[in-house]
Structure formats: structure tokens, C-alpha cells
A protein has these predicted regions:
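Conserved RNA-binding domains used in RNP assembly and mRNA/RNA metabolism
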Residues: 2-87
Length: 87
């Protein structure tokens, strides 16, 4: 998925308003950032399901931890760096 597809998914948004997540298998998924995701001290929910429901971000901790759930109930612990998540 490239930034053109990101714009297609989130029409009218800049790329810096979209959170990119790269999974272990190299697939990338994208999620809209909520306004307070990097400033709230508590976990905030990102209310956006992408890729037709296959992947869903259920919560993100601004202190650099996020969790992704897949439909197969697998979870991945991810690290947040400069607005992007990496496994």
C-alpha cells in the first residue's frame, strides 16, 4: 500500500495525519490518527477499522506501545517511533 492508496482511503487528509503500521510479514496497514493520540497520558482508542476489517487497531499508548488485533485473534506488540509503528 502506498501513499496514493492512503489518500484514497482517507480522502482529504495529509500523509502526516495517517499512522503507518508495518507488520512482520512486510504488509503495511494504515489508520487515521485521533487528535489527541500523542498528548493524552492514557490509552486512547483509534476508532478506525481498515483493510475491510482484517486488521484493526484497538488501542494505542502514547508512551510508545500499541496493540493490533487481527481477525485470527493474533496480537502484535508494536513500538511507536516518529509517528510510525514498527514491529
Amino acid at each position: 500500500m502506498n501513499s496514493g492508496l492512503v489518500r484514497e482511503l482517507f480522502e482529504g487528509l495529509d500523509d502526516d495525519e495517517v499512522l503507518r503500521i508495518e507488520l512482520i510479514n512486510g504488509n503495511k496497514i494504515y489508520c487515521l490518527l485521533s487528535d489527541n493520540v500523542f498528548v493524552a497520558p492514557a490509552i486512547v482508542k483509534i476508532m478506525k477499522t481498515i483493510k475491510k476489517g482484517k486488521y484493526q487497531i484497538i488501542m494505542i499508548d502514547p508512551n510508545a506501545i500499541a496493540v493490533i488485533c487481527t481477525m485470527s485473534r493474533e496480537t502484535y506488540d508494536l513500538k511507536l517511533q516518529r509517528g510510525e509503528l514498527y514491529v
